[in-house]
């Protein structure tokens, strides 16, 4: 893993560096997940970052995990507990604010969101806004600004702390890209746990592993 703080800025890929044959888990993480010293390596990025997330997020108490309102590409449409997005949130160390809603009642309003008072908001955007081949973020900035200034949500923890994240719909395509999304979100929501994790590089490796183009902007901010 590259050093440096968890990325909170525009995420772009513009090279084709290859994935190392093996990746070595930090000693603390290897010890936490019960990996022997002579077997601290992972042969794929998926194995590596799955283990890393499990180790780091395992340090959280339940009361420290954030509640997230996930908004799909449709405005005010959220996700149920049987969805892949729900599983993604769990793997990122968060709770789905809509987990108790019936699968046929996933269209909500600002009043419901305000009452749930989420700690963070995730908005899925088309791959024309964020995705492979996208390097300009004006559209993403505009969408995020609209969420941050949505009047009814001003009192929520997500807006007060500006925990509003935009995610490319292309990251929902495969297990590897959903893991990339989880790394982005976990690094953004829990920066103290992921200060040494380069989320940009992690996502590049995972997107490459999925066989998809990794040059572009997939997460904002």
Q: Predicted regions: what is each one?
A:
Residues 1-221:
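N-terminal ligand-binding lobe of clamshell/alpha-beta domains
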């Amino acid at each position: 893993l590259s050093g440096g703080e968890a990325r909170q800025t525009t995420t772009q890929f513009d090279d084709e560096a290859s994935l190392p044959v093996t990746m070595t888990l930090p000693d603390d993480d290897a010890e936490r997940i019960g990996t022997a010293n002579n077997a601290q390596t992972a042969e794929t990025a998926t194995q590596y970052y799955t283990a890393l997330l499990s180790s780091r997020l395992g340090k959280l108490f339940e009361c420290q995990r954030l509640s997230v309102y996930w908004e799909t590409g449709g405005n005010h449409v959220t996700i149920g507990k049987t969805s892949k997005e729900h599983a993604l949130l769990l793997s990122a160390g968060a709770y789905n604010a809509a987990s108790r809603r019936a699968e046929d009642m996933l269209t909500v309003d600002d009043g419901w969101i305000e009452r749930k008072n989420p700690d963070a908001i995730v908005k899925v955007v088309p791959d024309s806004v964020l995705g492979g081949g996208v390097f300009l973020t004006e559209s993403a900035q505009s969408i995020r600004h609209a969420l941050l200034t949505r009047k009814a949500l001003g009192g929520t923890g997500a807006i007060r702390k500006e925990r509003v994240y935009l995610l490319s719909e292309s990251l929902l395509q495969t297990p590897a890209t959903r893991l990339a999304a989880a790394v982005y979100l976990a690094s953004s929501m829990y920066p103290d746990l992921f200060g040494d994790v380069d989320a940009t590089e992690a996502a590049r490796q995972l997107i490459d592993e999925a066989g998809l183009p990794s040059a572009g902007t997939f997460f904002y901010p």
